[in-house]
Amino acid sequence: GIIYPSDFIPLFERNGKICKLDLYVFTEVCRLISHWEKNGKEAVPVSVNLSRQHFTDEDFLEQFADIAQQYHIPAGMIEFELTESIFFENHQINRVGDAIKRMHELGFACSLDDFGSGFSSLGLLKEFDVDSIKLDRSFFLNMSGQKARDVIACLVDLAKRLKVKTVAEGIEDWGTVEYLRSIGCNMVQGYVFAGPL
């Protein structure tokens, strides 16, 4: 049967294999982008998750850069998704900031995933130079009230002021898509278009 990430990722984090898994996924993404481009297909930017365990090694990004170079991946084609949990380890805060700068130097984008699911999201936006925020699906579960819509509109407006793109996660209906379009949300993902690939 299907094994979901919520089942196997904690196991890989406990047994120390999560960094190898991230590198494997990254390599496969690079291979696919290269394959698409060689076959005349337009490649689209792809987001990959990055475990907080990578941040214990100051030079971890060089390995990712070497793989991207091996596959001739153009700058801007790969975005690293960071979750709020990466920022909770106080001794790693400086490393995370330095790593985000290095990501940009190497041609990678960086997003803050599941934005709004924790308590420190706004503070993170102030401190770290991310390219986009991915608004957590919990924002969109009950949008019948004006207050919920106002919160989302304020977040999108704040992101625009900071020159950060917004991505709405977990969208399941066209009414929400139209609302997000009307307030200027940059991108939408969810079952309204397709299931996970």
Task: List each model region and its residues.
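Short helix-loop capping/hinge motifs at secondary-structure junctions, enriched
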Residues: G1-I3, H35
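Short beta-alpha junctions and helix-cap segments that line functional grooves
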Residues: P5, I93-A99, S121
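Conserved, function-defining core regions and hallmark residues within catalytic/recognition domains
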Residues: F8
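Catalytic core of bacterial c-di-GMP phosphodiesterases, primarily the EAL and HD-GYP domains
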Residues: G16-R95, G170
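Alpha-helical scaffolding segments of alpha/beta enzyme cores, especially the outer helices
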Residues: R31, E62-D66, R95-E105, D150-D157
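EAL-family c-di-GMP phosphodiesterase catalytic domain
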Residues: G1, S51-E58, Q70, M77-H91, ...
